């Protein structure tokens, strides 16, 4: 039985096709043999710097082949990785590091000043450039022994997601959950290793987990899409065509932008065979444009919070949908059960809305260093008390249609999906209330326009939106900034004295953008 994801590489692509290209990064190609060797060299450097096992190691690198090598090197060393967003404000990075307390940090030399500025001692940093030279030696038997000491229930990585207190939560994924998900994906999605993956999502996003392990196990090629192309649909679609990309796993926002600009009619994409999407609702009228433009491709809608290891349901588009029809999130992945529970914890019937809960081996290990938050959402299955049986309460509302397909409705609370990112609106509010001159604030999400909208009270003098944006730029990534701002004399309240979020949401939906 497979215990560690590195068995995908060691017994898979590196053994079967060592000279095949594993990663393409801005014109530079790396074979599977090179990927394996550099990763082992990185592991050797990590162990020499600090001989620990089953500890978190942070990766502070932009999206590049070196980051993949660092991730694999960390796992070879018997530890687990967490990829950081180098573009995040320094305070957010500090918050993550203070929660995770990594044993070491892997970075590049050009990022050393940034690490120093946030308080990371140079003694804790291993520079990835040092692993990419021929002179590094390593003891293969020693690394193998380190891996043998690890169990499949040990952590593989930590993915940092928005937290309600202003500090991101570290979702801890295991080897077993990842292996279970990938074994399902290989079979259900008919993945055979011929794929050229157009890797667009950041490596600190959970989509990378599928891309990486498809590469390692089957010999698929990861073609890293340069970050600079993400905001330019024309350049992005040109890249997909020129690189003969055959597999993408993108958030719908990117695909909607391409559709909106009429680019699907201008570019033939005969190589594109698998189109996966997740993270937010894909408007059917835009999805239909994609299906008409690439009739030979298979389109698959996936759903799942990070806490269940990438995704837990899927829907292969196997029939026609009208432009206004809702799109199912489908059926559970293998070895996963979806429970839709009512407020009184009974199973909902067909058409009845309830909270979507997940059970199975793909559940995360919890939130790193936060047992209290973990216990709130990873709970005993409320349908019985006969044995320990954890379920994850997603906070999403869903129902089953007459076909037995699961239909997503929305969030139960203030957590949203925006541009593919999961965001706690309360984290934004937490930072808003720290801005001088703001007395109170409430953030709502206009899902129709995909706008984060801020309503706020001031302390007697105007606080311009530009001032708010500047303050938020120091603590939050850009995708979490409000895009609409409304200063109000007083926030509306409901009978129990709380801010009436529904009234504000209604106002946001009714307000003319002009």
Predicted segments with their positions:
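AMP-dependent adenylate-forming
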Residues: 1, 5-6, 105-148, 178, ...
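ATP-dependent adenylate-forming carboxylate-activation enzymes
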Residues: 61-65, 82-98, 109-112, 220-243, ...
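Conserved AMP-binding/adenylation subdomain of ANL enzymes
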Residues: 169-196, 206-246
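Hydrophobic alpha-helical segments in the ANL/AMP-binding
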Residues: 10-11, 65-85, 185-186, 206-220, ...
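Conserved pre-ATP/AMP-binding loop-to-beta segment of ANL
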Residues: 142-160, 167, 191-197, 203
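Gly/Ser/Thr-rich phosphate-binding loop
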Residues: 217-220, 245-249, 259-328, 337
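AMP-binding/adenylate-forming domain of the ANL superfamily
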Residues: 1-158, 173, 180, 283, ...
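Conserved AMP-binding
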Residues: 61-64, 85, 191, 201-205, ...
């Amino acid at each position: 039985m497979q215990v560690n994801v590195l068995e995908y590489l060691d017994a898979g692509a590196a053994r079967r096709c060592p000279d095949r290209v594993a990663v393409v990064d801005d014109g530079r190609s790396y074979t599977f043999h090179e990927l394996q060797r550099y990763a082992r060299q990185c592991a050797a450097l990590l162990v020499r710097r600090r001989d620990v096992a089953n500890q978190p190691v942070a990766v502070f690198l932009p999206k590049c082949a070196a980051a993949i090598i660092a991730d694999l090197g960390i796992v070879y060393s018997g530890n687990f990785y967490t990829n950081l967003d180098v573009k995040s404000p320094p305070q957010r990075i500090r918050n993550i590091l203070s929660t995770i307390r990594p044993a070491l940090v892997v970075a590049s030399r050009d990022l050393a000043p940034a690490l120093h500025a946030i308080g990371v001692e140079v003694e804790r940093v291993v520079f990835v450039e040092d692993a990419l030279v021929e002179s590094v030696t390593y003891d293969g038997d020693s690394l193998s022994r380190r891996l043998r000491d690890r169990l499949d229930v040990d952590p593989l990585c930590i993915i940092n997601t928005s937290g309600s207190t202003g500090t991101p939560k570290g979702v801890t994924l295991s080897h077993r959950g990842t292996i279970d998900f990938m074994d399902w994906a290989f079979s259900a999605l008919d993945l055979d290793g011929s794929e050229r993956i157009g890797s667009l999502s950041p490596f600190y996003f959970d989509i990378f987990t599928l891309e990486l392990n498809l590469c390692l196990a089957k010999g698929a090629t990861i073609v890293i899409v340069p970050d600079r192309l993400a905001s330019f649909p024309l350049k992005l679609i040109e890249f997909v065509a020129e690189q003969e990309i055959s597999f993408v796993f993108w958030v719908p926002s990117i695909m909607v932008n391409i559709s909106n600009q009429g680019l699907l009619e201008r570019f033939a994409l005969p190589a594109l065979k698998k189109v996966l999407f997740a993270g937010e609702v894909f408007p059917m009228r835009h999805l239909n444009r994609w299906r008409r433009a690439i009739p030979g491709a298979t389109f698959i809608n996936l759903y799942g919070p990070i806490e269940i290891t990438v995704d837990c349901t899927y829907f292969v588009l196997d029939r026609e949908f009208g432009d206004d029809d809702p799109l199912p999130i489908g059926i559970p992945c293998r070895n996963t059960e979806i429970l839709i529970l009512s407020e009184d914890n009974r199973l909902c019937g067909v058409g009845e809305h309830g909270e979507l809960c997940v059970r199975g081996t793909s559940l995360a290990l919890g939130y790193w260093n936060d047992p209290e938050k973990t216990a709130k959402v990873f709970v005993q299955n409320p349908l019985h008390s006969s044995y320990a049986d954890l379920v994850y309460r997603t906070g999403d509302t869903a129902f089953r249609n007459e076909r037995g397909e699961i239909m997503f409705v929305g969030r139960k609370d203030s957590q949203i999906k925006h541009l593919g990112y999961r965001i706690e609106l309360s984290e934004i509010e937490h930072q808003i209330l720290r801005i001088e001159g703001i007395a109170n604030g409430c953030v709502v999400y206009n899902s129709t326009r995909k706008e984060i909208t801020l309503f706020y009270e001031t302390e007697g003098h105007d606080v311009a939106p530009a001032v708010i944006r500047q303050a938020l730029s120091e603590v939050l990534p850009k995708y979490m900034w409000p895009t609409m701002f409304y200063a109000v004399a007083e926030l509306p309240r409901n009978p129990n004295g709380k801010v009436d979020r529904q009234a504000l949401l209604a106002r946001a939906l009714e307000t003319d953008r002009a």
